[in-house]
Design a protein with these regions (language model features):
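Conserved hydrolase catalytic core segment
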Residues: 105-147
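Catalytic histidine neighborhood in serine/cysteine hydrolases
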Residues: 276-293
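Conserved alpha/beta-hydrolase "acid-adjacent" motif
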Residues: 264-270
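Conserved acidic catalytic loop of the alpha/beta-hydrolase fold
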Residues: 89-107
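Catalytic histidine-centered segment of alpha/beta-hydrolase-like enzymes
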Residues: 290-302
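Alpha/beta-hydrolase
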Residues: 148, 152-246
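Short beta-strand/loop motif that positions the catalytic acidic residue
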Residues: 257-259
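Conserved HGGG/HGGXW glycine-rich cap/lid loop of the alpha/beta-hydrolase fold
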Residues: 20-76, 81
Length: 324
């Protein structure tokens, strides 16, 4: 299917939560099925393409910049106090605060990469507030998955990984992501900038298979500082926080996971394990010739979202007024 035409938000705002202000937007049909888009990274922030995956006549499309990212305040690279709060529990609380603020009873979740992981964390914490899940390029914060993404996959990109590793000298036994977290917290802005450059260069290398282009925002010093700081903090901090053991709580929810066979940063074994633990209501769709994202995967997500809406399993349920 073709994506829907571009649309603009009909409402935006800032939501005050403990320690942060979150930028949010709504678009589509104010009386439609509530749907929440969760961006990746962590720290990638919102663009606008996510709106085109939802029928604007069917869905009330909600999105927000997660704490520390995008237009939310303060930025993670500018506030150690904010950064210290960036964990799954707080991310989930932020989502729940937004749901209450917008008067949504329950919503469809669509998350990409880290956003897909966050969608599962929210769903297992608040299963009665979720209508279904569509995840793309799921990556988790399990220590084993983070170590693969930051070290193991270096066997496939030895040149890029050597540059990443050599830019962060560390004692034996120190995880690379821990070394980068320390560099990105340095009081020296030159040290922080070099570390951010090295990190985003590695990000572009390990997601390059399958024709996925680099993120042009990495050319922006502010963006790469925020992105690298959040990624390294979350990846170093959360460890086994991904709720793999809690998936039985959401086995009743219709779920589609779309993943690229060529995704070497988060191999297809990750969503395969999730789908097996989830049960028969979780469908894994593998796109054979794409990696950590791509147009076919985006199209598959749009189709999955439309299919869930057409099953009549998703009904708009509002606890308050439809606007903003």
């Amino acid at each position: 299917m073709s994506l829907f035409p571009p649309i603009e938000p009909h409402a935006t705002g800032m939501l005050g939560v403990p320690g942060a202000e979150l930028f949010w937007e709504t678009s589509g049909n104010p009386r439609g099925i509530p749907a929440l888009y969760l961006h990746g990274g962590p720290g990638a922030g919102l663009l606008s393409g996510h709106r085109r995956r939802f029928c604007p006549e069917t869905f009330r499309i909600v999105a927000f910049d997660q704490r520390g990212a995008g237009r939310s305040l303060p930025r993670a690279d500018e506030s150690a106090e904010l950064l210290a709060t960036c964990d799954f529990r707080t991310f989930v609380r932020d989502i729940e605060a937004l749901r209450v603020h917008l008067g949504v009873d329950a919503w469809l979740l669509h998350g990409v990469s880290f956003g897909a992981s966050l969608a599962l964390a929210y769903a297992t914490s608040h299963p009665h507030r979720v209508l279904g899940v569509v995840g793309m390029a799921l990556s988790t914060t399990r220590a084993s998955d983070v170590d693969w993404m930051t070290e193991g996959v270096g066997k496939l990109f030895p040149e890029a990984w050597a540059e990443l590793s050599e830019a962060a000298p560390r004692p034996p036994g120190t995880r690379l992501v821990e070394a980068y977290r320390a560099l990105l917290a340095s009081p020296d802005p030159n040290v922080r900038e070099r570390a951010a450059r090295s990190w985003v260069a590695w990000e572009e290398a390990h997601v390059s298979l399958g024709g996925k282009g680099g993120d042009p925002r990495f050319a922006d010093p502010r963006f790469r500082a925020t992105f690298a700081t959040l990624v390294c903090h979350v990846f170093a901090e959360l460890g086994e926080a991904f709720p793999m053991g809690d998936l039985a709580r959401v086995s009743h929810l219709p779920t589609v996971l779309v993943h690229g066979r060529l995704d070497v940063s988060s191999p297809v074994g990750v969503p395969f394990e999730v789908a097996r633990r989830w049960g028969p209501r979780c469908e894994l769709q593998v796109v054979e010739d794409e990696g950590h994202g791509g147009p076919k995967m985006v199209d598959a997500c749009a189709r999955a979202i439309a299919r869930l809406a057409s099953t009549h399993l998703l009904e708009p349920r509002l606890t308050g007024p439809a606007s903003p």
